[in-house]
Design a protein with these regions (language model features):
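Non-transmembrane, interaction-prone alpha-helical and coil segments associated with secretion
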Residues: 1-177
Length: 177
């Protein structure tokens, strides 16, 4: 295998192996994070709805966890509250529905995302020449004590959740079809 292999194929093969290894590590880490829940609980988390005093529509545990995870920094909390038309009291009421295992899970998710900060910032800086500004964690009060908070990627729910503001979106997005 000559210079062409060394220049072309070796880097491709190494990148492919590195990608496969990173995917395996990520899968294992996520499996460990979610291992606090049974399969049945994970299924019910997405489908079983409950009411929260002061919140108009019933929600799922998955949505309640999303509220908690988005409360871990000021910018996500603001987006959550303005996008879903929730007050701080409603956010707190939703967080208060979660059990101790749920709040420990949320902190472990924030901690997991923190493990990528240096590498992702280094990559962004190498690609753009600008180092991203870190999102500052903000403490979150739960019934089981204060969580440190942390970064959680903002993702807009394309399935339109059942939180009150989404009821308006459903009407808006389906009225032109």
């Amino acid at each position: 295998m000559g210079p062409a292999y060394a220049a072309i194929m070796r880097p491709i093969n190494e990148a492919t192996w590195n990608r496969a290894e990173r995917l395996r590590q990520g899968r294992d880490a996520l499996k460990k994070l979610f291992s606090v829940y049974s399969r049945r609980e994970l299924v019910e988390m997405k489908s079983k709805r409950f009411t929260v005093p002061g919140v108009a529509a019933p929600i799922t545990k998955e949505q309640a966890l999303g509220v908690l995870l988005n409360s871990g920094n000021a910018s996500n909390l603001q987006r959550l509250m303005s996008g879903q038309k929730l007050t701080r009291d409603q956010v707190q009421a939703i967080i208060d529905t979660l059990d101790e295992r749920d709040v420990r899970f949320a902190q472990s998710v924030w901690d997991y995302f923190e493990t990528f900060r240096k590498e992702s910032f280094d990559l962004e800086e190498s690609l753009t020449g600008v180092r991203p500004e870190a999102v500052k964690a903000q403490p979150v009060q739960t019934r089981f004590g204060m969580l440190r908070g942390g970064y959680y990627p903002v993702a807009y729910d394309t399935d339109l959740s059942a939180l009150p503001a989404d009821q308006d979106k459903v009407g808006t997005q389906t009225s032109g079809r």
